[in-house]
Regions:
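All-alpha prenyltransferase/terpene-synthase fold signal
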Residues: 1-171
């Protein structure tokens, strides 16, 4: 895109802050608490992902924790907010929140797989972006688990580089 990720982040920050303003104006403390908690979780997930950047031997549990804190938390909050606005009982709120979390996990796992196995025209964005950014996702975790020692060394070296090359991605 012309403006890159930075404008998307700024727009997202603006929308989040606007949501907080609206919740304060509305006086809905349940939603305000949920949104503030969710933004904290997303930030924790970003930090955790940065801590593990370039680790080809990332454990699956750590990957799941990262996507729980990021994508799943966002989907979970969206469904919970909808249930709060609809004045549903707590059992239904909890069920929708759980649904949102699981939908977020499924979405992120599928998105991560498509980053390696889709075509750019179909996927709608650059293929291999996670690889080039040094983000280890489930396809790499599974590949690393099934790899022999030579393949593991290749993956480890590829992810330790400051910049990964197209040749590394294609190999």
């Amino acid at each position: 895109s012309i403006w890159g990720n930075q404008s998307s982040i700024l727009v997202g920050d603006y929308l989040l802050s606007r949501c907080f303003e609206m919740m304060v104006e509305d006086g809905n403390l349940e939603i305000l608490k949920l949104l503030s908690s969710t933004s904290s979780k997303i930030a924790q997930g970003e930090v955790l992902q940065l801590e593990h950047k370039g680790e080809a031997d990332l454990l699956e549990e750590n990957y799941i924790k990262i996507i729980e804190l990021k994508t799943a938390a966002l989907f979970s909050a969206a469904t919970r907010v909808g249930s709060c606005i609809s004045n549903l009982d707590n059992k239904k709120k909890d069920a929708l929140e759980s649904y949102g979390k699981n939908l977020g996990l499924a979405f992120q796992i599928a998105d991560d797989a498509l980053d390696y196995f889709s075509k750019e025209k179909i996927f709608g964005k650059e293929i291999g972006k996670d690889f080039f950014e040094g983000k280890v996702t489930l396809p790499i975790i599974i590949l690393f688990q099934k790899a022999n020692s030579i393949e593991r060394a290749f993956l480890t070296n590829s992810f330790k580089k400051k910049e990964r090359e197209k040749k590394d991605f294609e190999d």
